[in-house]
């Protein structure tokens, strides 16, 4: 009998073991769709990004008009740009839901997979930030100025570090050039990291909604979950294309339709919606270095998730206290996102401070306590 090519060929074998004959728990829900959706997001962003890069000029005098030229004169340039800009939003929606799923079902106990995932999140945030600077509108310029300036809070080396990153004494042409280089490079690094993420995942196999070992009940990935993933793609592409075609600027900032002007500061400097929760945490601390540390901690705290797991059960499926805390945390993140979009005045300052305190308290203190308490409840 001739050997099956997809099982014997060195390259096809890799694809086969990852996407076709992969043993998958039979009971994974739609929450497990977001990994493949993130892969599709990445491919879409790389494709639209490459097409945009062919028409973009990384120069302060030409960047803004080159983007306008792409939208006006290039065949379907407006569509490519709208898909790329809104695709970033969908990328973040998917990654936040993916992380939320991992948190709820205890997937962070696969430590290597979880840690590479957090590094992926940081890489994605860096990519989105440098990408937002490229159109060289007002919010691009001032966003770059404000966020890069945060590094000056680092004692002793801060100011030198910022000027080194800028390539001068302010955000200018060298900054734009290197940000374009970084924005081009990082997605390919993300793709590489995603492969490492998958390699670690396939070492242990997928978790499932019950948080228990599922070796006794696995089914092949194809056709069951490949088909389910295609449904997921359709469900994601519908709102993405709807947004890109009907209301492409809904999530953007009107300030960015004005070319960058170092002499005029916008009334409210704020990042895109997907960074607002972290921005709110940054602003809630009146000290510069303290704010920067809190901003870093807001994402880096995810690395501690495996260490703070005190429950005997993996998933939160049968843990009511942890469930309550989880959904409180989700609501709290919405509040932080909203506060981040508001001006720095009463009552938003105090709301932001309380929400920031709640965020860290739930993650670092209440989750371990709830886990230990639920262990006690198992005895009754």
Swiss-Prot record:
It is found in: Mitochondrion inner membrane. SUPFAM superfamilies: a domain/subunit of cytochrome bc1 complex (Ubiquinol-cytochrome c reductase) (SSF81648), Transmembrane di-heme cytochromes (SSF81342). The chain crosses the membrane at residues 34-54, 78-99, 114-134, 179-199, 227-247, 289-309, 321-341, 348-368. Its main location: mitochondrion. GO terms for molecular function: metal ion binding; ubiquinol-cytochrome-c reductase activity. Heme b b562 binds at residues 84, 183. Keywords: Electron transport, Heme, Iron, Membrane, Metal-binding, Mitochondrion, Mitochondrion inner membrane, Respiratory chain, Transmembrane, Transmembrane helix, Transport, Ubiquinone. InterPro entries: Cyt_b/b6_C, Cyt_b/b6_C_sf, Cyt_b/b6_N, Cytb/b6-like_sf, Cytochrome_b, Cytochrome_b_C_euk/bac, Cytochrome_b_N_euk/bac, Di-haem_cyt_TM. Disulfide bonds: none annotated. It is a multi-pass membrane protein. Heme 1 (or BL or b562) is low-potential and absorbs at about 562 nm, and heme 2 (or BH or b566) is high-potential and absorbs at about 566 nm. The cytochrome bc1 complex contains 11 subunits: 3 respiratory subunits (MT-CYB, CYC1 and UQCRFS1), 2 core proteins (UQCRC1 and UQCRC2) and 6 low-molecular weight proteins (UQCRH/QCR6, UQCRB/QCR7, UQCRQ/QCR8, UQCR10/QCR9, UQCR11/QCR10 and a cleavage product of UQCRFS1). This cytochrome bc1 complex then forms a dimer. Belongs to the cytochrome b family. This is Cytochrome b. It comes from Alca torda (Razorbill).
């Amino acid at each position: 009998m001739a050997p099956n090519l997809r099982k014997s060929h060195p390259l096809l074998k890799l694809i086969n073991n990852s996407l076709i004959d992969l043993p998958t728990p039979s009971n994974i829900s739609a929450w497990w769709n977001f990994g493949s959706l993130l892969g599709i997001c990445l491919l879409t962003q790389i494709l639209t990004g490459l097409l945009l890069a062919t028409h973009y000029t990384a120069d302060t005098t030409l960047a803004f008009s080159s983007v306008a030229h792409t939208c006006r004169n290039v065949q379907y340039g407006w569509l490519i740009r709208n898909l790329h800009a809104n695709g970033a939003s969908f990328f973040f929606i998917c990654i936040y839901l993916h992380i939320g799923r991992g948190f709820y079902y205890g997937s962070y106990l696969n430590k290597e997979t979880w840690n590479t995932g957090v590094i992926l999140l940081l890489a994605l945030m860096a990519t989105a930030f440098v990408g937002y600077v490229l159109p060289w509108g007002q919010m691009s310029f001032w966003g770059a100025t404000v966020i890069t300036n945060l590094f000056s809070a680092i004692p002793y080396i801060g100011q030198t570090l910022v000027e080194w990153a800028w390539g001068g004494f302010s955000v200018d042409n060298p900054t734009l050039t290197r940000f374009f280089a970084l924005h081009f490079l990082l997605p390919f690094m993300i793709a590489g990291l995603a492969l490492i993420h998958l390699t670690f995942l396939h070492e242990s196999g997928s978790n499932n909604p019950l948080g228990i070992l599922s070796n006794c009940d696995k089914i092949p990935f194809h056709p069951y979950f490949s088909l389910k993933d295609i449904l997921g793609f359709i469900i994601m592409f519908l709102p993405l294309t709807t947004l890109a075609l009907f209301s492409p600027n809904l999530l953007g900032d009107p300030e960015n339709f004005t070319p960058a002007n170092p002499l005029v500061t916008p009334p409210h400097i704020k990042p895109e919606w997907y960074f607002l929760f972290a921005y709110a945490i940054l602003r809630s601390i009146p000290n510069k270095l303290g704010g920067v540390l809190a901003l870093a901690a807001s994402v880096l705290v995810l690395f501690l998730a495996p260490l703070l797991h005190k429950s005997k059960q993996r998933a939160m499926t049968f843990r009511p206290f942890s469930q309550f805390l989880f959904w409180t945390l989700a609501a709290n993140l919405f509040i932080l996102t909203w506060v981040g979009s508001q001006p720095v005045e009463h009552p938003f300052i105090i709301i932001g401070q309380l929400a920031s305190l709640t965020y860290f308290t739930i993650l670092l203190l209440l989750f371990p306590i709830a886990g230990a308490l639920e262990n006690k409840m198992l005895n009754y």
